[in-house]
Amino acid sequence: MPHYNCHSVLCASKRTRGAVGQRILHMLAQGGRIEIEKNQKKRIASVKCLTRDGWHHPGVDLDLFRKLKRKKAVSSSGGGPYRITRRGLELVRSELDNR
């Protein structure tokens, strides 16, 4: 049985989290969007990530959405869905497109 110390497990989870964020940014850069639903108190209740073709993309939760917003990687205009910003495009690391 392999021995893991807390530090290596923590680093692995951060890497995984960063990889998910990069995947979402890359999908947004290709024309995807993040739609939000608010509750009665006008607070964000849930987020849904859609590809440019309208397919639901799993992996975006409230924490990741807030992180992207805090980094100014996504923004909304006129009450519409959240889309990638110029800052978000700078944060995207290039990724091979498998099409």
From Swiss-Prot:
**InterPro entries noted in UniProt:** YjhX_toxin
UniProt record similarity statement: Belongs to the UPF0386 family.
Q: What is this protein called?
A: UPF0386 protein mll0189
Organism for this UniProt entry: Mesorhizobium japonicum (strain LMG 29417 / CECT 9101 / MAFF 303099) (Mesorhizobium loti (strain MAFF 303099))
